[in-house]
Amino acid sequence: MNGDLNSWDKFCNYLWFDKKLNIWLDISKINFTSKEIKNLEDKFKDVFSSIKELENGAISNIDENRQVGHYWLRNPSISPSSKIGEEIRADINSISEFGKQILNGDIKNKNNQQYTDVLWIGIGGSGLGPLLITESLQKCSKGLNFSYIDNVDPFLISEKLEELSEKLSTTLFVVVSKSGGTPEPRIAMEIIKSHCENNSLEWNSNAIAITMKGSKLFKKATSENWLKIFNLQDWVGGRTSITSSVGLLPLALINENISEFIRGASLMDETTRIRDFKNNPAALLSSAWYLTGDGIGKRDMVVLPYRDRLQVFSKYLQQLVMESLGKKFNRNGQVVNQGISVFGNKGSTDQHAYVQQLRDGIDNFFCIFIELLDSPSTNIFDEKENPKEYLSGFLQGTRSALSSENRQSITITLEKLNCFSLGALIALFERAVSFYAELVNINAYDQPGVEAGKKAAANIIEYQQKVSHLLDEGGEYSINDITSLFDNSVSEPIFFILREMCFGNDNYLVKGDWSNPNSLVIQKINS
């Protein structure tokens, strides 16, 4: 068998389908030969063994000396201890019961009013996971209304507070931070808490924490008597937290089926434990990534779900794939600069945008098409003008147009989008990421680059405080004056700090020209 993208035999030979999951996976439009597949099958013997060790509780995040246990969340019986399994089941039951009490009105605010909204404060996976849940699954007029603060953009925070101004008293404030020390959710939390208190609105009795036991956030929520604290286990990373409290609480508050979501993820986990390469969808999917990128991530992943409800999925995968696989070193300490860049939006919108380049421009990508076979139960569509059939036609047409130019793609087909299938889809990509990491000998569960970024940001914040304090004391200062007091290597950061602090601010007198940083002299004139 050759690498022909349009080979019917290849399509039939590599099409995967599972009747319990009702999911299809087609990797036939990836360039590979039967010999290449055979070589990978041999490698997967070790991959399967490594994943088994991870699931059994091996220390997988070496930097933080912790296990990686998101697979246990959907099947507590495989967790390494009965205590962990019992805690997982208790957390699920607690969230389910809490959701029912909120939606039924058994738990109300201090004015005996039923809750109407949720303001979710979390960053990274703590924001993207819940956003994916609500955007994909929430039905009109069902459950609470969700708003998100996933950044410290002052306009975002002020706009959300303005949008909710009439409903803040009936809003649940959910703060997600495993350690409680992540600056972005902490800052947003403090701003909103202060706003509530300054306007005689309740915060403590409306606030919910999702965090580790004993964390800074846990202690704060406990001491201030917040409405509820849900557990976020040490062995759950942010990008794989969607089957933890982080994803289950949104499901409960939009009145969706937690059990079905977990069942879908669990069944996909079980299916991808099969050691038969061609019957393991995560093995096939990760192999396609490996082969199309020559094992070094030479091609970007373009995610195109042909359903609006899955538009957030490309952003979700961007974090899952890039944070997991973007690594400088392999496990042997060698510099490898691994990774797969991910972007995408939705079909058929993208056919009128960057698909032009995908077909006719630089060949540095592969597409992942995601299609759904269901359509809404309604009589508003004419049989001759059914949008579902048009959408399917657009997908198949784009796929065909790409392959005619030898542009590679993968197609995943779901029977329908619901809690069960979304759980399965997420688990499929989680497993594929783990498998790919094993193939290229990197650790998918550490994030030294993220930690380096956090440390650098903390240094800048420290300089911001030093500069502010210096200017408060009075006197005129040039950038050279300031760096000579602190560190001569930070001239550029000091310029950025001064620009953010002083430009357009009447409290500061600025002499010189902003286009010539060395000419600037700044003095605080109003306190």
Swiss-Prot record:
Metabolic or biological pathway, per its Swiss-Prot or TrEMBL entry: Carbohydrate biosynthesis; gluconeogenesis; Carbohydrate degradation; glycolysis; D-glyceraldehyde 3-phosphate and glycerone phosphate from D-glucose: step 2/4
GO annotation terms (biological process): gluconeogenesis; glucose 6-phosphate metabolic process; glycolytic process
Pfam families found in the cross-reference section: PGI (PF00342)
Its EC number(s): 5.3.1.9
Top-level class of the enzyme under EC nomenclature: isomerase
Gene3D superfamilies: Glucose-6-phosphate isomerase like protein, domain 1
Catalytic activity: alpha-D-glucose 6-phosphate = beta-D-fructose 6-phosphate
Catalytic residues (UniProt): 323 (proton donor), 352, 454
Alphabetized GO MF terms: carbohydrate derivative binding; glucose-6-phosphate isomerase activity; monosaccharide binding
Span of the signal peptide: none
GO cellular component term of the entry, any: cytosol
Keyword Isomerase: yes
Subcellular location: Cytoplasm
UniProt keyword list: Cytoplasm, Gluconeogenesis, Glycolysis, Isomerase
Biological function: Catalyzes the reversible isomerization of glucose-6-phosphate to fructose-6-phosphate.
Record-stated family: Belongs to the GPI family.
Name under which the protein is recorded: Glucose-6-phosphate isomerase
Organism: Prochlorococcus marinus (strain AS9601)
